[in-house]
């Protein structure tokens, strides 16, 4: 540790000696005024930095000289192009914003030129929905007079007649479609009304049938009474110990009830 500390101190001392030996490059302040903070913080480049820069420049010069010598030995020549741009540099044109509504976009009319671009060529405006054939030709001619040609002018009467015929055909077709739709809707409403009436009649009949049905609460046949149904099924296979018949238990035997009545009338004892 002592050696390391001593070596670092020696290096610092050598660095300070080199800095003091080097000539100051910072300008002196006039009239003995105190220099500003930026001037005081600026330090002159160290000798190591200058030596490194000089070595790099010398290495680059040697490299260029070697390349030129090798090219000369190979018979190659060095060409230097000096091109001067005589055209003045103009600033890049910014984005041109044009406000247009849906009508102008659909019509396909050219967008008017702006005041800044009067000298430049203006291309046709953007088109949205385009029409083809004989559809809406009159509107397109109003917006674009160039679309009309001599042949189209000669055939204008024939095209107008055909357009009117097409419009009449379209009107008749639309009327037929509307009539068919109305007829189908009326038929569907009648079918739904008849179905509702049939459902109402059926529900009334079922309600009357439920009201007229006799319900025995002792023999309920619901979903929650599965144990009772199983018991009734088992009883149907059992034989009575009193009369010997199947289908009832001893406590439900009609002969036993009849015997009990006879014994009560006679005042005898009851068999249990």
UniProtKB/Swiss-Prot annotation:
Compositional bias of type Basic and acidic residues: which residue ranges?
Answer: 175-215
The UniProt regions of compositional bias labelled Acidic residues, in chain numbering, are 113-122, 152-174
The record's statement on gene disruption is: Completely abolishes the ability to produce any liamocins. Blocks the expression of the PKS1 gene and reduced expression of the EST1 gene.
Q: Which PROSITE patterns match?
A: ZF_CCHC
Residue intervals of every CCHC-type zinc finger in the record: 240-255
Q: Which domain of life is it from?
A: Eukaryota
Q: What induces it?
A: Expression is regulated by the cAMP-PKA and HOG1 signaling pathways via the transcriptional activator MSN2. Moreover, expression is also increased at low pH by the pH signaling transcription factor PACC.
Residue numbers spanned by region Disordered: 1-49, 102-215, 246-272
Polar residues bias located where? Answer: 1-10
For this protein, the record's Gene3D superfamilies field holds: Zinc finger, CCHC-type (4.10.60.10)
GO CC, alphabetical: nucleus
Q: Name one Pfam family in it.
A: zf-CCHC
The chain's disulfide connectivity reads none
Where in or outside the cell is it found? Nucleus
The biotechnology note for this entry reads: Liamocins have high bioactivity against the pathogenic bacteria Streptococcus spp. and can be potential new specific inhibitors of oral streptococcal biofilms without affecting normal oral microflora. Liamocins are also able to inhibit human cancer cell lines such as breast cancer cell lines T47D and SK-BR3 or the cervical cancer cell line HeLa.
* Keywords of this entry: Metal-binding, Nucleus, Zinc, Zinc-finger
**SMART domains assigned:** ZnF_C2HC
InterPro entries named in the record? Znf_CCHC (IPR001878), Znf_CCHC_sf (IPR036875)
GO molecular function annotation: nucleic acid binding; zinc ion binding
State what this protein does. Transcription factor; part of the gene cluster that mediates the biosynthesis of liamocins, glycolipids (also called heavy oils) composed of a single mannitol or arabitol headgroup linked to either three, four or even six 3,5-dihydroxydecanoic ester tail-groups. Positively regulates the expression of PKS1 and EST1 that mediate the biosynthesis of liamocins.
Please give the name of this protein.
Transcription factor GAL1
What is the species of this protein? Answer: Aureobasidium melanogenum (Aureobasidium pullulans var. melanogenum)
């Amino acid at each position: 540790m002592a050696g390391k500390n001593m070596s670092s101190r020696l290096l610092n001392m050598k660095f300070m000696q080199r800095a003091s030996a080097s000539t100051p490059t910072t300008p002196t302040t006039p009239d003995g005024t105190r220099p500003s903070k930026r001037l005081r913080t600026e330090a002159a480049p160290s000798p190591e930095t200058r030596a490194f820069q000089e070595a790099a420049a010398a290495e680059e010069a040697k490299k260029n000289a070697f390349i030129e010598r090798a090219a000369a030995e190979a018979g190659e020549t060095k060409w230097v192009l000096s091109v001067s741009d005589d055209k003045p540099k103009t600033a890049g044109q910014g984005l041109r914003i044009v406000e247009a509504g849906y009508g102008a976009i659909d019509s396909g009319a050219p967008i008017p030129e702006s005041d800044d671009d009067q000298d430049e060529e203006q291309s046709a405006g953007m088109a949205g929905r385009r029409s083809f054939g004989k559809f809406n030709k009159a509107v397109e001619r109003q917006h674009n007079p160039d679309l009309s040609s001599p042949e189209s002018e000669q055939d204008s009467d024939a095209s107008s007649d055909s357009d009117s015929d097409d419009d009449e055909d379209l009107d008749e077709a639309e009327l037929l479609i509307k009539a068919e739709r109305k007829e189908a809707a009326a038929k569907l409403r009648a079918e739904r009304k008849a179905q509702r009436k049939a459902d109402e009649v059926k529900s009334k009949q079922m309600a009357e049938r439920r009201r007229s049905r006799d319900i025995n609460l002792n023999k309920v046949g619901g979903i929650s009474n599965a144990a009772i149904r199983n018991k009734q099924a088992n009883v149907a296979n059992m034989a009575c110990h009193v009369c010997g018949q199947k289908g009832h238990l001893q406590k439900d035997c009609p002969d036993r009830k009849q015997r009990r009545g006879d014994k009560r009338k006679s005042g005898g004892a009851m068999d249990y």
